[in-house]
Amino acid sequence: MVVKVGINGFGRIGRIVFRNAIEHGEVNVVAVNDPFIETHYAAYMLKYDSTHGQFKGTIDVNSNGLTVNGKAVTFYQERDPASIPWGKHGVEYVVESTGVFTTTEKASAHLKGGAKKVIISAPSADAPMFVMGVNEKTYDPSVNVLSNASCTTNCLAPLAKVINDNFGLTEGLMTTIHSYTATQKTVDGPSSKDWRGGRTAAQNIIPSSTGAAKAVGKVIPSLNGKLTGMSMRVPTANVSVVDLTCKTEKPVTYDQIKQTIKKASEGELKGILGYSEDALVSSDLNGDSRSSIFDASAGIALNDHFIKLISWYDNEWGYSRRVVDLIAYIAKVDAGK
């Protein structure tokens, strides 16, 4: 089954969700809204990408929007989500990727335009969060607004799940070494709420806060209160890495951990959790569609209960693929299939 989807916000995630939807096959984007991007500029931004390269298909501009690989995509420039006529195009699921409408109340405005469900491509203060491979099976069709959590939570949660399910995770600290993003500065500038965040992204390692580790407790309730973490923003354009230092309930060797993660990556978490023994660096993972790629040769163990695990993720491409996967999954559940 192919699901009709709309995207609100044609920024980094909006455009990369669009590209992933074309590759996916089960999701068809038929409408896009962004009040700040007209269609000719949208075509240019979709075609050329400094990080992920030039779009391989065809893009044509017409009076209603774009034709991408022969399929029509209507464009709107509405500021109020309630004014976007999603229903006119048969849109069932809307990807809310502006970063502005991240609460249930705000995101619900899309329902007024005819959409059936809204998937927020960011953490939400009150909408239920789902991480593919971790808790998507708890999805209830009565939910109209849901969140795909964050890119970092999507990397950390599958890893934490494997450790917790097999060895018991008693407590842990996470650091994500995270590529800079659009909210950061090219030169030092004002940032009154986060002074460090106002410093030049390309010249600095910038300590920052993140709720990604605590959010794991929302998708894996048994880990609630057992994980927290922070972020280090670094001068790379894309690809990030999670460093999870944790204690296990059961005694375990690092080799046992590697074997267990490898098995999961080839089984129930295939396509979501990866496993590699290669000498990887961040650019090797650019464009990787998996949520979390465990670096077996980078982790260490202090003893049988205290370990450090390293896992890579393309914070743009991998995360956007999970947004599309989540839509395809809930569409099947909603259809009773």
Curated annotation (Swiss-Prot):
EC category name: oxidoreductase
Effect of residue 28 to D: In strain: ATCC 26032 / G217B
Record-listed NAD(+) binding positions: 12-13, 34, 79, 315
Top-rank taxon, per record: Eukaryota
GO-annotated biological processes: glucose metabolic process; glycolytic process
Gene Ontology CC annotations of this record: cytosol
Keywords noted in UniProt: Cytoplasm, Glycolysis, NAD, Oxidoreductase
Catalytic activity: D-glyceraldehyde 3-phosphate + phosphate + NAD(+) = (2R)-3-phospho-glyceroyl phosphate + NADH + H(+)
Active site per UniProt: 151 (nucleophile)
Principal location class: cytoplasm
Record flagged with keyword NAD: yes
EC number: 1.2.1.12
UniProt-annotated location(s): Cytoplasm
Positions contributing to D-glyceraldehyde 3-phosphate binding: 150-152, 181, 210-211, 233
Coiled coil: none
Effect of residue 60 to E: In strain: ATCC 26032 / G217B
Pathway field: Carbohydrate degradation; glycolysis; pyruvate from D-glyceraldehyde 3-phosphate: step 1/5
Annotated site (Activates thiol group during catalysis): 178
Family as reported in the entry's similarity comment: Belongs to the glyceraldehyde-3-phosphate dehydrogenase family.
Quaternary state and interactors: Homotetramer.
Protein name, as recorded: Glyceraldehyde-3-phosphate dehydrogenase
Organism: Ajellomyces capsulatus
